[in-house]
């Protein structure tokens, strides 16, 4: 069973409303575009979708047991945080939205927005008391048109190493992105990081992307990590 990939880390970390519409699952022409909905079908910037057909997925409709584990009685705040991070493990249907938001040339005609989707697995690759590493792996099945009308053959899976996120409790040394492919080591005092977790995000080749400190918040209906302001 697949989950919607809703990593609510109020930093926009893979954020976006993912919809359980059958038309999006099947990648037909009637996609529910997440960020480009304001362009209608007659607009020159009307959104477009993927040209391939993917594996049919069955979405979970009930909360996962990992969610309930976060709210067990008697847990410390740190243990709640750890369980929230570990709850990201699993199978997901993820959406990818590409849309130009900044124009550096005048005149300039932006490309039409594009949206596609895929299936992704999240695995913990390191777990200690103060450190958790989660590796994202794309596992894509493509439907190939068969000989008969409306007949499809499911091809072999395409497995792609995707991004990685490392979480460290009360981290005092950050590798902060400072723009133009440069990063700066930033030291923090132990007092300033009390109760906080750093999230370091890495590219598919394990090179750094960005890192930030933040605090987890746990409510009755959601858990969220709020990042401090940082370059991305």
Where are these regions (language model features)?
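Extended amphipathic alpha-helical segments with heptad-repeat/coiled-coil character used for oligomerization
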Residues: 126-180
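Extracellular structured ligand-interaction cores
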Residues: 89-91, 117-121, 131, 160-164
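Sec/Tat signal peptide C-region and signal peptidase I cleavage site
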Residues: 16-19
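Hydrophobic/aromatic beta-strand elements that line small-molecule binding cavities or substrate pockets
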Residues: 110-112, 116-126, 135, 232
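Amphipathic/hydrophobic helical signal segments and adjacent flexible N-terminal regions
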Residues: 21-87, 100-105, 110-112, 131-133, ...
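Short, intrinsically disordered, charge-balanced linker/junction segments flanking boundaries
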Residues: 224-232
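Generic short beta-strand segments
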Residues: 93-102, 137-139, 228
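Bacterial N-terminal signal peptides
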Residues: 4-14
């Amino acid at each position: 069973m697949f989950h919607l990939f809703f990593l609510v880390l109020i930093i926009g970390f893979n954020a976006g409303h993912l919809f359980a519409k059958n038309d999006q699952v099947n990648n037909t022409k009637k996609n529910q575009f997440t960020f480009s909905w304001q362009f209608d079908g007659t607009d020159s910037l009307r959104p477009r979708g993927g040209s391939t057909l993917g594996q049919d997925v069955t979405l979970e409709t009930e909360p996962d047991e990992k969610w309930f584990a976060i709210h067990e009685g008697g847990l410390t705040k740190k243990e709640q945080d750890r369980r929230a991070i570990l709850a990201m493990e699993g199978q997901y249907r993820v959406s990818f939205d590409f849309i130009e938001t900044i124009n550096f040339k005048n005149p300039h005609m932006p490309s039409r927005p594009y949206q596609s989707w895929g299936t992704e697995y999240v695995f913990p690759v390191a777990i200690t008391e103060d450190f958790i590493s989660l590796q994202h792996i794309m596992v894509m099945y493509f439907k190939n048109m068969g000989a008969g009308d409306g007949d499809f053959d499911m091809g072999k899976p395409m497995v792609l190493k995707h991004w990685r996120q490392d979480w460290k409790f009360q981290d005092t040394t950050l590798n902060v992105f400072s723009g133009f492919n440069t990063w700066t080591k930033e030291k923090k005092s132990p007092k300033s990081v009390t109760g906080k977790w750093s999230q370091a995000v890495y590219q598919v080749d394990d090179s750094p992307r960005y890192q930030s400190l933040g605090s987890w918040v746990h409510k009755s209906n959601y858990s969220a990590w709020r990042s401090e302001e940082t370059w991305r």
